UniProtKB/Swiss-Prot annotation:
Binds 2 magnesium ions per tetramer. It comes from Staphylococcus epidermidis (strain ATCC 12228 / FDA PCI 1200). Transmembrane segments: none annotated. Tetramer of two alpha and two beta subunits. GO terms for cellular component: phenylalanine-tRNA ligase complex. It catalyses: tRNA(Phe) + L-phenylalanine + ATP = L-phenylalanyl-tRNA(Phe) + AMP + diphosphate + H(+). SMART domains: B3_4, B5, FDX-ACB. Belongs to the phenylalanyl-tRNA synthetase beta subunit family. Type 1 subfamily. It is found in: Cytoplasm. This is Phenylalanine--tRNA ligase beta subunit. Keywords: Aminoacyl-tRNA synthetase, ATP-binding, Cytoplasm, Ligase, Magnesium, Metal-binding, Nucleotide-binding, Protein biosynthesis, RNA-binding, tRNA-binding. Residues 708-800 form the FDX-ACB domain.
Length: 800
């Protein structure tokens, strides 16, 4: 937003330099990105009166002009502008003057004729060509009315000014207007804010006799208002208005269109002007567009509409795309006599979707998207009517023709001085706090220390007590917050918490295994929000997402990790191993806060060990991924159990469910081939674990055990079992019968093939026996070993 200091003084007059004002505004949270000084690099620029023009004797495209600069004698200037003419009042750079770009004006001879100065175009004095009025695009600027020769030209065109450029955050849409900015400045300097003139001399004719309004989509258009102005005269707007628009980055068109844009900048309320005689009916109907309905917009483009678009119609055909752009056949032209001024409230989400889809971003649509102040809708329409009466000679008809309800202009919020002072460390009285709010234009009521603040609709960033406290701190001054040392009841030395220590251990373990940490977005598309989710829980969707791809809170970390791996592989980084520790979100129904759960996820693809000088290479596989997970469990002193399972998105035969103390906490598996192919990935393996559940169980340390004083005994067994029997089932049987001397087990071979029946496999297991208190005897080991073998036989295993 570009804020002209000359324009701002209409509403609030502060005796401060623009630099000081910009610094004060920045300290309150609105960043002033730049200050544009139109007087910079300009010297000796005055108004000149062209007394005569004669053709240059030696050049067809040059003219010799005698120009009165308010001095004793006129000066001769050779000018090549095609629109220069006798009697004009123009901008002249005198000899010794300077123009932007380091141009110095000197006496010169042009094709043999003396020239003492330069008649200037707007571009030559620093005005961008994209905001220069079209009739001056290829020539000099000509004043529409006589100006005393010798007058400072910058003052004559209101460029003796400095303009602040605001870099606004989306929550401060109120500062997208001159009036909104004036409220802010008035509060900062505790001065009065003057509102614009609104009252017109209305005729006795009523607009209600000429126009009716019907809104069929009140959920998208809660309020639609119009006024009618007759007998307008189309022409240029006054110089001061033209140059205020230019300084705000808008090209002047004509008085009617300029007034619409002027009020937009003044109030932040988009308006639209219809040519009443071109509407084609006395009825305006607002509705949703019909699918594949078409209309031609002001830019001359034929637009195909969707049923999500809002259209303004004459009861039959669209005459405007609501909140985005008008239609071409009802636009204001030089032949326009009567205009209908429209002000409305449109649904921000609908406007954003329409403007983005059609690539029609404008000053109006951007304001509707952020939400407009209901208190300013009718004021802005009345202001436009006042300006049309004054600068377009229009006659304003009495009465407003509208549909809907503006609702409340304020949101009441209660607060106390004690709450304010405890939060920000001030020591303000009720009166001082109330004064700050009233300077901001907020009405207040104080009942026994309970201050009710009525927040106006223009301040959509204020909805809770803490927002009000922030306003007090901003306006009173962050610099005024006293410095205090923190006071602690129980002072302890800084150290890692138990959870932080465990997390550091997990990260070191994963990074030691070659995985890199990733941090991905918490928001995913609605279609992928429940991918890989173990729980069937509601999702949480944003009310106003910035894009469909980031509209819903995730229930798994894997969708974005898969995207990250796909991105790397597409750029020839084919060996990727990532992990992430982050939160996922599960809904609890309407009106309930969601559950936030921390997860640990990983993804591996390509080679785990690259080709080395030894010629060895090891690709990522299921068991390697499982080994990474088991290593985490070992570091946290946890015992994971694994069983075959199925998860949507994973290979049905290469997936294991991970459980802890009988509760499922995650899974390991290979990406389903279809999903992998869709992401241009080869075999890719993932794991996801409920990190919170792991932290609850983990003791975070490993008990010390001394080196055994007595030797252990190992026995190897080979078991022939059915193909569907898993090694974990066999190990479970072994441990159940191993008594207290079975120290460890290890599966060291699995064989399928010759010498075995079809549907059979052989699993070789090493059993380690140890007694920490006594020397093991063969009798005791044999007894326990035989017990284990008998138990295995009962479950169908054949001892080989």
């Amino acid at each position: 937003m570009l804020i002209s200091n000359e324009w701002l003084k209409d509403y609030v007059n502060v005796d401060q330099s623009v630099q000081a004002l910009a610094e004060r505004i920045t300290r309150t949270g609105i960043e002033v990105d730049d200050i544009i000084d139109y007087t910079k690099d300009i010297k000796k620029l005055v108004v000149g009166h062209v007394l005569s023009k004669t053709p240059h004797p030696n050049a067809d495209k040059l003219n010799i002009c005698q120009v009165d600069l308010g001095e004793e004698e006129p000066v001769q200037i050779v000018c090549g502008a095609p629109n220069v003419d006798e009697g004009q009042h123009v901008i002249v750079a005198k000899v010794g003057g300077r123009l932007p770009g380091g141009i110095k004006i000197k006496r010169a001879k042009l094709r043999g004729e003396r020239s003492e100065g330069m008649i200037c175009s707007l571009q030559e004095i620093g005005i961008s060509s994209h905001v220069t009025p079209k009739n001056y695009e290829s020539g000099i600027y000509v004043f529409p009315e006589a100006v005393k020769p010798g007058t400072d030209a910058l003052e004559a065109i209101y460029l003796n000014d400095q303009v602040m450029e605001f870099d606004l955050t989306p929550n401060r849409a109120d500062a997208l207007s001159m009036v909104g900015t004036a409220y802010e400045v008035a509060a900062l300097y505790q001065t009065k804010m003057n509102k614009p003139q609104l009252t017109s001399n209305e005729s006795q004719e009523s607009a209600k006799d000429e126009l009716t309004i019907e809104v069929k989509n009140e959920d998208k258009v809660p309020y639609y208002s119009t006024r009618v102005v007759h007998d307008v005269t189309i022409g240029p707007s006054p110089v001061w208005m033209q140059f205020r628009l230019i300084k705000a980055g808008i090209r002047p068109i004509n008085n009617v269109v300029d007034i619409s844009n002027y009020v937009l900048l003044e109030y932040g309320q988009p308006l639209h002007m219809f040519d009443q005689e071109q509407i084609g009916s006395q009825s305006i109907e607002v509705r949703q567009a019909k699918k594949d309905e078409t209309m031609r917009t002001l830019d001359g483009e034929e637009r195909r509409l969707l049923d999500t678009d809002i259209v303004i119609t004459n009861g039959k055909d669209p005459i405007a795309l609501g909140g985005v752009m008008g239609g071409d056949f009802s636009e204001v032209t030089e032949q326009t006599r009567h205009v209908v001024v429209e002000g409305a409230i449109f649904d921000p989400v609908s406007i954003r979707h329409t403007s983005r889809r059609l690539n029609l971003r404008s000053e109006s649509s951007s304001r509707f998207e952020k939400g407009i102040a209901t208190e300013f809708v009718d004021e802005a329409v009345d202001r436009a009517c006042y300006l049309l009466e004054r600068y377009a000679s229009g006659t304003v008809l009495k009465d407003r023709v509208s549909h809907g309800d503006l609702g409340s202009f304020v949101t009441p919020i209660e607060i106390t001085a004690d709450k304010v002072n405890r939060t920000i460390g001030f020591n303000l009285t009720d009166e001082e706090i109330i004064d700050i709010f009233e300077q901001l234009g907020f009405d207040t009521e104080n009942k026994n220390g309970e201050i009710t603040v009525n927040v106006p609709s223009r301040r959509k960033d204020i909805s809770i007590k803490e927002d009000l406290i922030e306003e007090v701190a901003r306006i009173y001054g962050y610099d005024e917050i006293p410095s205090t040392l923190p006071v602690f009841k129980d002072v302890t030395s800084g150290e890692l918490t138990d959870r932080q220590f465990k997390t550091r251990t997990v990260k070191e373990t994963l990074e030691g295994a070659g995985l890199d940490q990733a941090i991905t977005y918490s928001l995913v598309s609605k279609n992928h929000a429940t991918d890989f989710a173990l729980q069937n829980r509601p999702t949480i969707e944003l009310l106003m997402p910035m894009s469909e791809a980031h509209s819903t809170l995730r229930q798994s970390l894997l969708p974005h990790l898969i995207d990250a791996v796909s991105y790397n592989v597409a750029r020839k980084n084919t060996n990727v191993k990532l992990y992430e520790i982050g939160r996922v979100f599960f809904g609890n129904g309407e009106g309930e806060l969601p559950d936030e759960v921390e997860y640990l996820s990983g993804i591996l693809t390509g080679d785990f060990v690259n080709n080395t000088w030894q010629g060895k290479k090891e690709s990522v596989d299921f068991y390697l991924t499982k080994g990474v997970v088991e290593r985490i469990a070992e570091k946290l002193n946890l015992q994971f159990d694994f069983r075959a399972g199925q998860i949507d998105g994973l290979h049905p035969g290469r997936t294991a469910i991970v459980s802890l103390n009988g509760k499922d906490i995650g899974f390991i598996g290979e990406l389903h081939p279809t999903l992998a192919a869709n992401n241009d990935l080869k075999r890719t393996y993932v794991f996801e674990l409920n990190y919170d559940a792991m932290m609850e169980v983990s003791v975070g340390y490993i008990n010390y055990e001394p080196i055994p004083r007595f030797p252990g005994v190992t026995r190897d067994i080979a078991l022939e079992v059915n193909h569907e029997v898993t090694s974990s089932e066999l190990l479970s049987i072994i441990h159940e019968n191993g008594e207290d001397i079975l120290n460890d087990t290890l599966v060291f071979d699995v064989y399928e093939g010759e010498h075995l029946e079809k549907g059979k496999k052989s699993i070789a297991i090493r059993l380690s026996y140890l007694d920490t208190e006594n020397t093991l005897t063969d009798e005791r080991v044999n007894a326990v070993h035989d017990k284990i073998l008998e138990a295995l036989k009962k479950h169908g295993a054949i001892i080989r």
